[in-house]
């Protein structure tokens, strides 16, 4: 019984750590070399996006193309898989959306 309890605590602690440690804020467009930094962050973290979609609510971000994306993961998929040269302008919806 003691082993089961300690296993449950370990699983809970790991789950909590993952819920808060996975977030990967993309660099804002005001930073120099932001597209290169954005691509690096996306490549490092895109494999975590499937997990993020289950545990965290989407938080919209505004891209440099003035399109509102549902999350950093959504913007990363557009950059990596569709080859768009866009960066994150700011958190929240774009003003024209």
UniProtKB/Swiss-Prot annotation:
Residues 1-21 form the signal peptide. Glycans are attached at residue 85. The keyword Magnesium does not apply. Disulfide bonds join 42-76, 49-73, 62-94. The record marks 51-52 as: Reactive bond. One of its GO terms (cellular component) is extracellular region. Keywords: Disulfide bond, Glycoprotein, Protease inhibitor, Repeat, Secreted, Serine protease inhibitor, Signal. It holds the Pfam family Kazal_1. It is found in: Secreted. GO terms for molecular function: serine-type endopeptidase inhibitor activity. Residues 36-96 form the Kazal-like domain. Its main location: secreted. SMART domains: KAZAL. Probable serine protease inhibitor. PANTHER family: SERINE PROTEASE INHIBITOR, SERINE PROTEASE INHIBITOR KAZAL-TYPE 8. This is Serine protease inhibitor Kazal-type 8. The gene is SPINK8.
């Amino acid at each position: 019984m003691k082993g089961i309890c300690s296993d449950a605590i370990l699983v809970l602690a790991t789950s909590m750590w993952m819920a808060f440690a996975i977030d990967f804020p993309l660099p804002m467009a005001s930073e120099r070399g932001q597209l290169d930094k954005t691509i690096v962050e996306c490549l490092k973290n895109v494999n975590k996006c499937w997990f993020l979609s289950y545990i965290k609510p989407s938080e919209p971000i505004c891209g440099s193309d003035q399109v509102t994306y549902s999350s950093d993961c959504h913007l990363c998929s557009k950059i990596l898989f569709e080859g768009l040269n866009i960066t994150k302008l700011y958190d929240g919806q774009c003003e024209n959306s």
